[in-house]
Amino acid sequence: MRLVILDNYDLASEWAAKYICNRIIQFKPGQDRYFTLGLPTGSTPLGCYKKLIEYHKNGHLSFKYVKTFNMDEYVGLPRNHPESYHSYMWNNFFKHIDIDPNNAHILDGNAADLQAECDAFENKIKEAGGIDLFVGGIGPDGHIAFNEPGSSLVSRTRLKTLAMDTILANAKYFDGDLSKVPTMALTVGVGTVMDAREVMILITGAHKAFALYKAIEEGVNHMWTVSAFQQHPRTIFVCDEDATLELRVKTVKYFKGLMHVHNKLVDPLFSMKDGN
């Protein structure tokens, strides 16, 4: 497990974007060899998406041979609703890059048979050869995707009832009106993300500090679903200083002492212009 600590949100976002960029380019994707990327929504990854868009606009990175699978989607919210995760992804990322819309997979929260939709999503991931890099964020209660506290750590894509803490946190996106906030969602399972060949979790802000502490300094616990990634062979937690406030000083010092190693993963930043 790696813990990458940057000074602030912008630097953490840039490090994560550089890592994604380098992983895609090193993979050498092509017509018969797609890189498969798992993606989150929420406020945390916005900075990362902006940097990836910048790399694309500058000609360093193409998503032509990338397939994406999003973590979750609300149930019952129209696809074109401004707060649906379809809208989020297209407005904040997909419409700014060269990805084929047929390769951008997002769960349909309005499907006639929700369980069949979840099963089909799992099958699409298998057909794509599994996920090379799953990027995620977490809530203050340590949930990954919509795997709320108490979720099985071997769970698969399914329908979930949202915890009140999550509904309250999401109310800001619905004019503060709790009655407008969806109470159910389709989500990948913890096991779905664990199956990825690599996982990168973005954690920023003091309000996520206790969750980061639970994720790396205490044991694996289904009440803090992000802690499951202690058992993944290739996990990277990318955080800012504020997110480390609950960690032991020696933990922070240890991982900061490895930054010269971690930075070799993103420096130099590769470019498709160079023929990589």
Swiss-Prot record:
Record flagged with keyword Transferase: no
Similarity section: Belongs to the glucosamine/galactosamine-6-phosphate isomerase family.
Function field: Catalyzes the reversible conversion of alpha-D-glucosamine 6-phosphate (GlcN-6P) into beta-D-fructose 6-phosphate (Fru-6P) and ammonium ion, a regulatory reaction step in de novo uridine diphosphate-N-acetyl-alpha-D-glucosamine (UDP-GlcNAc) biosynthesis via hexosamine pathway. Deamination is coupled to aldo-keto isomerization mediating the metabolic flux from UDP-GlcNAc toward Fru-6P. At high ammonium level can drive amination and isomerization of Fru-6P toward hexosamines and UDP-GlcNAc synthesis.
Primary enzyme class: hydrolase
Reaction catalysed by this enzyme: alpha-D-glucosamine 6-phosphate + H2O = beta-D-fructose 6-phosphate + NH4(+)
Parts forming coiled coils: 105-130
GO molecular function per UniProt: glucosamine-6-phosphate deaminase activity; identical protein binding; isomerase activity
Record text on activity regulation: Allosterically activated by N-acetylglucosamine-6-phosphate (GlcNAc6P).
Name of the protein in question: Glucosamine-6-phosphate deaminase 2
EC number(s) on file: 3.5.99.6
UniProt-listed NCBIfam families: nagB (TIGR00502)
Complex and partners: Homohexamer.
Pathway(s) per entry: Nucleotide-sugar biosynthesis; UDP-N-acetyl-alpha-D-glucosamine biosynthesis; alpha-D-glucosamine 6-phosphate from D-fructose 6-phosphate: step 1/1
Membrane spanning stretches: none
Modification Phosphothreonine occurs at: 161
Tissue-specificity statement: Ubiquitous, with highest expression detected in testis, ovary, placenta, and heart.
Pfam families, per database record: Glucosamine_iso
Cellular component GO terms, alphabetical: cytoplasm; cytosol; nucleus
UniProt keyword Protein biosynthesis present: no
Top-level division of the source organism's lineage: Eukaryota
Keywords, sorted A to Z: Carbohydrate metabolism, Coiled coil, Cytoplasm, Hydrolase, Isomerase, Phosphoprotein
Primary gene name: GNPDA2
Subcellular location field: Cytoplasm
Active site per UniProt: 72, 141, 143, 148
